Amino acid sequence: MKRVILICYLILNATLLFSQGEKVNIIVFGAHPDDCDIDTGGTAILLAKLGHNVKFVSLTNGDAGHYAMGGGELAKIRIAEAKEAGKRFGVEYTVLDNHDGELMPTLENRLKVIREIRKWNADVVIAPRPNDYHPDHRYTGVLVQDAAYMVIVPNVAPEVPPLQKNPVFLYSEDGFQKPSPFKPDIPVIIDAVFDPKIYAMSAHKSQFFEWLPWTAGNLEKVPKDDKGRLEMLANWRSQAPNEALLKCAEKWYGNKASYAKHIEGFEICEYGKQPTDQEIMMLFPMLIR
């Protein structure tokens, strides 16, 4: 009974907060144009539909991710794809001009990340963990971690006012086990927006229908028609939630979690603000709906 009363109290407080029109600012970092889409696309759509402000930032321009072209020609295509994807997701999409495959955790890049977080006045910052097969993915995680404290330090990047409070920093889900596996704290069921997520992702034609199939040796299997391509992309992303995600989802969604087909999971990073359950519900109001 006490647990029921507590849940009702948290829901009431979160509902009151957002009924007053307060918006949440979420910024998501990825290494390449399309990374944010894969990891947080459904969550972004849900938050945007609730009126919150979401921004995707790619730390490289993606100019190496193709088998038949590269450099400036490819960068232009990938920037245009990201712009179209942003429209479909309902988010702002920024692509920084670092070369694909050459991202390094330099001071210059750290300052770029700090400025992006500050300019967005972020409440939540999402990025990959620094455990990954791709160096650009790893260093994206490192750069965001390195910015976590510095975003509130006035004398660092002083041309952009510091944040008055440290954001919540979250890791997006991955399957890597060493040095430690991903441990979800926040599960977002995206079943209701899975199809719109796939449609938005399909804006990255050079990646999902050319580059990635080529690297997998399946280029000849890519359908020629849009419907077939959407089905192919949906099948690729239709992965049943693992046990850890489902267990985490039960905490927030109750019995509804057992019916979930698609969940985006997030782990709280130790370096930023450590949110309470009530604060998590305020930042991710879809958890109480």
Task: List the predicted regions and their residue ranges.
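Bacterial N-terminal signal peptides
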Residues: 5-16
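Active-site rim/loop-helix segments in enzyme catalytic domains that contact anionic ligands
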Residues: 18-120, 142, 150, 160-161
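Flexible loop residues that form catalytic
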Residues: 62, 130, 174
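Short acidic, glycine/proline-rich loop/turn micro-motifs
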Residues: 66-69, 180-184
